[in-house]
């Protein structure tokens, strides 16, 4: 399943490219996606971070400090920076998380779940230090999704009634 929400697609195919270029990386990694998400302050994934009371500034700094540039022969100013193996696995895990929640798309919230699920990732370590486990993140995702569904339903009802 590679059916991305609009925001997730924008993060994965555009914004993280900018972050990889900015940090001098020759491959896209999950940290680039999360950094782009935090900077854009948009999407359900960002809402999940806020609901979990993640300090956005320290999380962003943690991501930035742990991104290492690499010089492996690929020019950073190329049109499209390729995804790393970790990034491919990250997307696969996001798909698994999406399916486990009964969703038919991969959204930014699933990207957060995937990042926390990757054992040695910067995000997983940050969340562990904050005392937040994967189950808590899933609960937060469900809350944010249900709020979104109810607001969409209310908006639709309003249009029908008017």
Predicted regions and their residues:
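Histone-fold recognition with a strong bias for associated Lys/Arg-rich disordered tails
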Residues: 1-162
């Amino acid at each position: 399943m590679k059916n991305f929400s609009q925001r997730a697609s924008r993060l994965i195919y555009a914004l993280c490219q900018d972050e990889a270029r900015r940090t001098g990386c020759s491959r896209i990694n999950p940290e680039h996606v999360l950094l782009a998400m935090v900077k854009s302050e948009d999407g359900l994934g960002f809402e999940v971070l806020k609901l979990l009371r993640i300090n956005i500034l320290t999380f962003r700094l943690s991501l930035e400090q742990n991104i290492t540039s690499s010089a492996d022969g690929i020019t950073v100013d190329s049109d499209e920076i390729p995804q790393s193996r970790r990034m491919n696995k990250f997307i696969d895990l996001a798909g698994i998380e999406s399916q486990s929640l009964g969703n038919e798309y991969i959204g930014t919230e699933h990207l957060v779940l995937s990042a926390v699920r990757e054992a040695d990732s910067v995000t997983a370590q940050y969340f562990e230090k904050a005392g937040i486990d994967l189950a808590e993140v899933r609960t937060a995702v469900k809350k944010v999704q249900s709020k979104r569904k109810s607001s969409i339903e209310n908006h639709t009802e309003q249009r029908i009634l008017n």
